[in-house]
């Protein structure tokens, strides 16, 4: 019994001493941390005492070397109209300022672990207003702002040896001069130009850190793919001196998918729609003309929409060539029907006049010949001749009517009033014909020479016996030509 009592007393004494030791360690630790905080506050006050923010580190000596690295947060927008792009990124700058060197304890215990760490002070961004910082700016900047939610996104970190890390997060809009000759099958190079505003290379030399850029692989753009980047540095000679400039260039490849569905595919379908008129009867004038005009206006609307999203540049772009050629194809389809209509009515009018002359070849003295020529069908045929697009045939109609059919032999009672009125137009048109003949004599000789030349050219054109041949060949020529154009277009720009 006595043995068990001694063991219990010994165990209790052991745990009591262990707890007391832990409590003592906590107290010592707390005192050390409290002393350290007091020492840090005193250290910061000491390093700022007598510190001149106007002078760069190592003033009057060797140039100060300032390291740079960037972390890309996001690409926000790229504008072809304004020739710029917007990007959000983190910029970190590194330099050494011996005036900010300090030594608190050498090593200390952290609150969360017992590992010793070197002296590093992470301070708020407001501390940057109390020390010297580089006057870094972006040479191609248009507009920038520093993020301030929930606090200003700035970082200042001091090392015991005077090393300074100065970081910030901001969004900037940078100029990017784009070459749009191959738009939208183009690729662009957009740069970030970093430079010191006031310090020349004799005072500040900037350089890229070993890992200059991060986050490019994770950045995404709706219309572009980032296929690579490169960094370089060079000296920029300006009116006020020579400055060190760091440059980061992004290689951007435009994605064609949006333009295929927004521009190219609708244009192709509109051109193919214009070919439908080749299968419509050539006498359906209203249908074919309406279809042709609709396709022309639709192509005009598409072209206007594309131009509204681009700057007003003078050179021709790839999409301009495609849209212009599509417009040419739909306009040519409309002109094709004009040729069909001209040929059809001109040929029909010639047949009518020939039939009238064959019907009444002699003088109008015999009543039976006059009755034969003066039928309802003849008058309707003369109306068709008046619709001919060839002016000479329209004028010849009235000459043949007056010369071969005597109005005194016409039995006007046999025909409806509309036909009788139509037949009475002969005198008026004969007067117009005589006036026109008098006007011709006053025209310049050059006009007559042009007419003779046009007649000679017209004589060389092969005569078409059937107007359907024009539509028949158009059904093959138009699709083949458009296919050949597309092959040449896409091969040229894709291989380029």
Curated annotation (Swiss-Prot):
Its main location: membrane. Residues 343-472 are cytoplasmic. One of its GO terms (cellular component) is postsynaptic membrane. It is found in: Postsynaptic cell membrane; Cell membrane. InterPro entries: GABAA/Glycine_rcpt (IPR006028), GABAAb_rcpt (IPR002289), Neur_chan_lig-bd (IPR006202), Neur_chan_lig-bd_sf (IPR036734), Neur_channel (IPR006201), Neuro-gated_channel_TM_sf (IPR036719), Neuro_actylchol_rec (IPR038050), Neurotrans-gated_channel_TM (IPR006029). It holds the Pfam family Neur_chan_memb. The chain crosses the membrane at residues 259-280, 285-306, 318-342, 473-494. One of its GO terms (molecular function) is GABA-A receptor activity. Residues 1-20 form the signal peptide. PROSITE patterns: NEUROTR_ION_CHANNEL. Glycans are attached at residues 39, 189. Disulfide bonds join 176-190. Keywords: Cell membrane, Chloride, Chloride channel, Disulfide bond, Glycoprotein, Ion channel, Ion transport, Ligand-gated ion channel, Membrane, Postsynaptic cell membrane, Receptor, Signal, Synapse, Transmembrane, Transmembrane helix, Transport. Residues 21-258 are extracellular. It is a multi-pass membrane protein. It comes from the Eukaryota. GO terms for biological process: chloride transmembrane transport. Belongs to the ligand-gated ion channel (TC 1.A.9) family. Gamma-aminobutyric acid receptor (TC 1.A.9.5) subfamily. Generally pentameric. There are five types of GABA(A) receptor chains: alpha, beta, gamma, delta, and rho. Interacts with Grd (alpha chain). GABA, an inhibitory neurotransmitter, mediates neuronal inhibition by binding to the GABA receptor and opening an integral chloride channel. Combines with the ligand-gated ion channel subunit GRD to form cation-selective GABA-gated ion channels when coexpressed in Xenopus laevis oocytes. This is Gamma-aminobutyric acid receptor subunit beta-like.
């Amino acid at each position: 019994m006595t043995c068990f009592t001694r063991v219990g007393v010994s165990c209790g004494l052991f745990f009591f001493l262990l707890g007391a030791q832990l409590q003592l360690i906590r107290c010592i630790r707390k005192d050390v941390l409290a002393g350290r905080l007091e020492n840090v506050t005193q250290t910061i006050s000491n390093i700022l005492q007598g510190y001149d923010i106007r002078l760069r580190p190592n003033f009057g000596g060797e140039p100060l070397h300032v390291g740079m690295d960037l972390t890309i947060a996001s690409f926000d927008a790229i504008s072809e109209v304004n020739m710029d792009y917007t990007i959000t990124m983190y910029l970190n700058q590194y330099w050494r300022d011996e005036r900010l060197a300090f030594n608190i304890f050498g090593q200390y215990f952290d609150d969360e672990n017992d590992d010793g760490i070197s002296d590093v002070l992470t301070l708020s961004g407001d501390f940057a207003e109390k020390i010297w910082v580089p006057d870094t700016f972006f040479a191609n900047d248009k507009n920038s702002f520093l993020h301030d939610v929930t606090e200003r996104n700035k970082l200042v970190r001091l090392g015991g040896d005077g090393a300074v890390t100065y970081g910030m997060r901001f969004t900037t809009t940078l100029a990017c001069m784009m070459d749009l000759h191959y738009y939208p099958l183009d690729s662009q190079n957009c740069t970030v130009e970093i430079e010191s505003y006031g310090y020349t290379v004799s005072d500040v030399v900037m350089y890229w850190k070993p890992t200059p850029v991060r986050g490019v692989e994770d950045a995404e753009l709706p219309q572009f793919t980032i296929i690579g980047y490169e960094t370089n540095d060079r000296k920029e000679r300006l009116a006020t001196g020579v400055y060190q400039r760091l440059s980061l260039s992004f290689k951007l490849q435009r994605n064609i998918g949006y333009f295929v569905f927004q521009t190219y595919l609708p244009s192709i379908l509109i051109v193919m729609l214009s070919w439908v008129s080749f299968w419509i009867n050539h006498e359906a004038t209203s249908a074919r003309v309406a279809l042709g005009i609709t396709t022309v206006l639709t192509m005009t609307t598409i072209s206007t929409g594309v131009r509204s999203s681009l700057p007003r540049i003078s050179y021709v772009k790839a999409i301009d060539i495609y849209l212009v050629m599509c417009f040419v194809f739909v306009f040519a389809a409309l002109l094709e029907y004009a040729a069909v209509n001209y040929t059809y009515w001109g040929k029909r009018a010639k047949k009518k006049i020939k039939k009238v002359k064959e019907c009444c070849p002699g003088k109008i003295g015999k009543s039976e010949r006059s009755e034969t020529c003066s039928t309802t069908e003849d008058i309707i045929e003369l109306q068709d001749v008046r619709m001919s697009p060839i002016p000479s045939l329209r004028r010849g109609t009235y000459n043949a009517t007056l010369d071969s059919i005597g109005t005194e032999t016409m039995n006007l009672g046999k025909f409806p009033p509309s036909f009788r009125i139509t037949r009475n137009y002969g005198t008026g048109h004969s007067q117009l014909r005589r006036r026109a003949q008098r006007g011709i004599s006053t025209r310049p000789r050059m006009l007559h020479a042009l007419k003779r030349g046009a007649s000679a050219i017209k004589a060389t054109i092969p005569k078409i016996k059937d107007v359907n041949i024009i539509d028949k060949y158009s059904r093959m020529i138009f699709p083949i030509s458009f296919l050949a154009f597309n092959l040449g277009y896409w091969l040229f720009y894709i291989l380029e």
